[in-house]
């Protein structure tokens, strides 16, 4: 399969009466001439790294090498455990995990780029949160990663997953779309509903710029991961309820590509615009590097 159209993937899944994850695993096995069991075990290792990166990021004492960030996941976790958060248990735990993984990345810890390091907290936060809440077996979570990967590959092929090309909409947007699609499948949705979840999640983040303070993947990147996982749950919830995207996923992806092309280079990972160019952003840059 070419992985250049989500609609085509869904059509093929429906034709073969398979969930997206099994279609993708079967195709990848044939394309790479590798046994499905081997591919599954490889993906399972990624899930293990994701889970470990959550635990690492919950350490309230760790700060990034720059000193700009650290401890937010710990603070959020304490609020959730004390039942002081306003968004409920699932949203609270998802935000905790997204912050934790992103913080692990900022501290140079081991993470899974899903699809990028800058958006690494969104997918694991979504899948680990729902699996814990619903007692979903790890094997099912691993399979959902194949669905997420296929969605990410379509976005990469049709547009981009790089902030330097498409802004943060390409990174956190892609991750949120991947997570939403996988959430739908984990919760018993159809391939078509996964497609709608992808479209809804991505169009909610269209236009989001990449403006890292001091050029580091910390401010505002870490908190944007919390936003991205919340958006994934919103999109999945809507899709599972039967809400459909008026604009097909493939067209939303293309729109994201065109928006990225229209963005100023100052808003695509160069740290020359947006939050990076604010007075405070510049002061933080000087604090880290001595100049800005």
Predicted segments with their positions:
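Generic N-terminal targeting/processing segments that precede catalytic cores or assembly contacts
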Residues: 1-109, 133, 242, 249-292
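Acidic-glycine-rich active-site phosphate/pyrophosphate-binding loop
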Residues: 89-105, 140-159, 204-212, 247, ...
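Glycine/serine-rich anion-binding loops at beta->alpha junctions
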Residues: 103-128, 169-174
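Alpha-helical support elements that line or immediately flank enzyme active sites
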Residues: 124-135, 180-188
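A structural-propensity feature for long, helix-poor, extended segments
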Residues: 146-178, 182, 204-231
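Functionally critical mobile loop/hinge segments
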Residues: 185-292
């Amino acid at each position: 399969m070419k992985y250049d159209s989500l609609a085509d993937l869904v059509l093929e899944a429906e034709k073969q009466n398979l969930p997206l994850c099994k279609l993708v695993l079967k195709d990848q096995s044939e394309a790479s001439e590798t046994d499905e069991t081997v591919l599954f075990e490889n993906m399972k290792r990624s899930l293990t790294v994701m889970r470990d990166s959550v635990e690492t990021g919950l350490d309230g004492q760790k700060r990034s090498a720059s000193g700009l960030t650290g401890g937010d996941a710990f603070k959020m976790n304490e609020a959730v455990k004390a039942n002081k958060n306003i968004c409920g248990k699932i949203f609270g735990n998802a935000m905790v995990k997204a912050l934790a993984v992103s913080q692990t990345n900022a501290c140079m810890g081991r993470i899974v780029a899903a699809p990028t390091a800058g958006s690494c907290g969104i997918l694991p936060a979504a899948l680990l949160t729902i699996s814990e809440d619903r007692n979903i077996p790890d094997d099912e979570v691993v399979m959902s990663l194949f669905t997420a990967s296929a969605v990410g590959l379509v976005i990469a092929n049709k547009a981009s997953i790089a902030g330097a090309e498409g802004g943060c909409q390409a990174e956190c947007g892609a991750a949120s779309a991947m997570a939403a699609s996988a959430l739908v499948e984990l919760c018993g949705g159809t391939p078509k509903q996964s497609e709608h979840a992808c479209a809804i999640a991505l169009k909610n983040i269209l236009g989001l710029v990449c403006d890292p303070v001091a050029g580091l993947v910390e401010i505002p990147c870490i908190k944007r991961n919390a936003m991205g996982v919340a958006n994934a749950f919103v999109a999945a919830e809507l899709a599972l309820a039967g809400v459909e995207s008026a604009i097909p996923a493939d067209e939303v992806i293309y729109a994201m590509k065109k928006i990225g092309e229209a963005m100023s280079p100052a808003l695509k990972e160069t740290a020359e615009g947006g939050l990076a160019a604010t007075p405070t952003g510049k002061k933080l840059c000087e604090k880290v590097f001595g100049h800005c």
